[in-house]
């Protein structure tokens, strides 16, 4: 088959009838329950693919990605063609207000919410906050839907395999998802009103196109009118010999509402070589004619025209690439459809796209009187109705890179700043991850305290039922905690604030009695005081008996009586007749009635407050092991009694300078257990450290780092190589961390690695609450 037959739209155009209604202008005749669409003799199926970090990769890594992308295209069956469709549009204003901005709660903190909203809106206005989705549509001319489905099963297997090598997720789309993509462009001002149910549609005999069709659509000479909006289609008609891989991302940045489609049709190898041979024969014939004419004119000095020589060189190069480098021939077509509110805006967007294309030595052609055909080619139908295709080899085709960088936009999440590559907002929510525990790592002055305090503030303002516990070794969090009405618990020998580690809240779900719940803590406490080597086998039974005795009044009162204290435990052990009990009591006495009785007092601070900060800056070395253990026990009790079924009522625990806790085996064990168990109790732990190397050499810390799905890497210097190795960062990402200013870095959220920046205006109340710089704090 000749290339002219491949280029023909007879097999790729689908249903081609004169529309008598707006619905009929949508060229889909039938949709099947499994998501297969039919347009006359064309069947299509659609998948969504995730973006990957291409822009921040090294040159070698980029080349590997392009090679693998070539594998994707090479796997297209000969009886199919592919459409790579990138849909780029601004977030809907209503969805933005609903899912990103803070809402009034009338709790005294609405002024802070309003200030955060102003900052988020300013960032969104500056960068547009464009949302991109990428799709693959594969079409075929099989004689029936059964044969088409069989082919799509094979294609899907290939796509899953090939894209998995790129760490790119592939998700098949059902009818509702496919129609919703179209709805966003046919009804631009009604993005949140899409409603479609396949079963009801089939049962009631309704036209599925009614759910997406606009009220009116008009195809003009060089633009399209869709209700009160305007659209225009263009196609690339000229390419350079070597295309820059930034071309696609550059085009998408010019227009806020755009559909960019790349139609790809494989040419069978036999047909490709026939075309090469025919082209070579024409070139050879041209050279013969020229030489013959030169002889006739007695001109023996002239050489073959440069154009013919160039054509000869191109043909030879194509033959070499296909025979020696396994390159495949494709027919490709790049089409864009973009939208605007006015014709003036549409003209400005046209100029912007043409200028950008010219900067990359490409040329856009305005398709006069072909807007309808171009529109139906660009939209994700899997149809091609434009014949001006371009012959490309695999290497050239993969330069049309659909990837740029990963984005995070989780509805109801909090704003972590802006993507350093695209400028889009990073809206994430740790509760959406499989394991939402986090680590924040940075050198001193890298901005880790400000990042963490800002996250606490944003979560506190967003989720009014959430609870927060902060372990603060440097007394940095008190201003923020006090501003939010939280409790600062100062832990030291002479502190006036006390909390009782034997406090207990009965959990109806587990029904664990208090003496059982506290047995492990008290045994660990005795190990800290007496030394683990001095604990005997029977000590646990003695401690268990004493705990059961002191908790009897609490249980008898149905958990309304005051909880016992360590002093009560000391008395219970001392009153037992067993000599060993009295030895344990003697070891406990200094913490029960002696000079270190800080944890033997009833709780005298409001531990029901949903924001509690444990200030351990003044903690002495002798009291530190017991204090740490008591504090962690209190946090553990709070987590265990948490509301488990409501993500908005999660418990958030922050450990600043976590390496201090990792030095003690019992504290380290608590952290290790927390990183594994907290998720079950609707709780999320966060570790903050500047000593990455210490964490990497500690098995417990290494496991925590490796198993945290949310990691914030701010500026790194001496530990940069360790961080790069642990998270597999590219050379550009490494340089970004080395040169990062305070508040800049890389966020790892699940499988996404996103460079970010999060500047905070200094003239805001939020900044004054977060900063630790002298002279800037309130």
Where are these regions (language model features)?
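A short helix-turn-beta junction within AAA+ P-loop NTPase domains corresponding to the substrate/partner-engaging
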Residues: 485-489, 700-713
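Hydrophobic anchor at the beta1->P-loop junction of P-loop NTPases
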Residues: 440
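Hydrophobic positions on the alpha1 helix immediately C-terminal to the Walker A/P-loop
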Residues: 451
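Post-Walker A helix-loop "phosphate-sensing" segment adjacent to the P-loop in P-loop NTPases
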Residues: 458-469, 638
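Conserved P-loop NTPase
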Residues: 730-778
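P-loop NTPase motor domains
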Residues: 52, 59-78, 89, 250-252, ...
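Extended, folded cores of ATP/NTP-driven motor/assembly subunits in large transport
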Residues: 2-403
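Conserved lysine of the Walker
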Residues: 448
